[in-house]
């Protein structure tokens, strides 16, 4: 594994190995306290971040590495100088680049023109670190990850894409339930279905909220993605039937609730579900660090 740009680029064994390593790191962190000794990692963020930035920074430091944060929120990469020049210069000093960008093309250019590993910390198309942490979380509750039946409810976005790739490659079942016009991009769905066919996964997309029945976990995200100027009032009525509340959890028979955060409480999910016994949101947040450290250890090994 040279970079970590998208889940779809991994084999089933590579994905399972990352989950296994993340479990080991979480259980025995002291054994890895020197795993990143002497390594310097640059973080380039065009978008705001809490969990991604803090989990990378603290995780890298816990393992003996050094993290440098470059705030790009006042302008996209490539405006002041080309992404190619940016990547090649950073590669002279840094051992890896972690990037959160508006365009996935920027991530790909960093990997193409740099000479060090690049990790996608979120782009418009994918959020692989989040999905890896989420399936690590599920793997802590299911002996066989392929037995998982996950339902995603709401707006099809970058998180949805990465979750679908994970489910397909791991041979799990995932139902994506979105209002009409808010499904993941067709070419992503086609890639996911090809991977599901290869690895034994089952991915279903529908607008029918009744399809929620018979799932182990319900996952949702904000109805409007970061940077989308659409007013919430314009879509609230359309999305209202897809709110995750106690009634929907009961209808699904779900034991777990998941959200990548930040959440709009009372909008896509109620407080009762967010703070309830079924909620895995803090476990997901903690697992971001362990999953990302597994990626870093793998890239540097």
UniProtKB/Swiss-Prot annotation:
The alphabetized UniProt keywords are: Amino-acid biosynthesis, Arginine biosynthesis, Cytoplasm, Transferase
BP term (GO), one: citrulline biosynthetic process
Q: What is this protein called?
A: Ornithine carbamoyltransferase
User: Which family does this protein fall into?
Assistant: Belongs to the aspartate/ornithine carbamoyltransferase superfamily. OTCase family.
- List the Gene Ontology MF annotations in alphabetical order: amino acid binding; ornithine carbamoyltransferase activity
Top-level EC class as recorded in UniProt:
transferase
Query: Where is this chain's protein located in or outside the cell?
Result: Cytoplasm
Q: Recite the lineage of the species.
A: Bacteria, Pseudomonadati, Pseudomonadota, Gammaproteobacteria, Alteromonadales
What does the record give as the reaction this protein catalyses? carbamoyl phosphate + L-ornithine = L-citrulline + phosphate + H(+)
Primary subcellular site in the record, as a coarse category: cytoplasm
**EC number(s) stated in the UniProt entry for this protein:** 2.1.3.3
Q: Where does carbamoyl phosphate bind?
A: 100, 127-130, 260-261, 288
**Which InterPro entries does the UniProt entry name for this protein?**
Asp/Orn_carbamoyltranf_P-bd, Asp/Orn_carbamoylTrfase, Asp/Orn_carbamoylTrfase_sf, Asp_carbamoyltransf_Asp/Orn-bd, Orn/put_carbamltrans, OTCase_ArgI
Pathway given in the UniProt record: Amino-acid biosynthesis; L-arginine biosynthesis; L-arginine from L-ornithine and carbamoyl phosphate: step 1/3
**What GO CC terms are in its UniProt record?**
cytoplasm
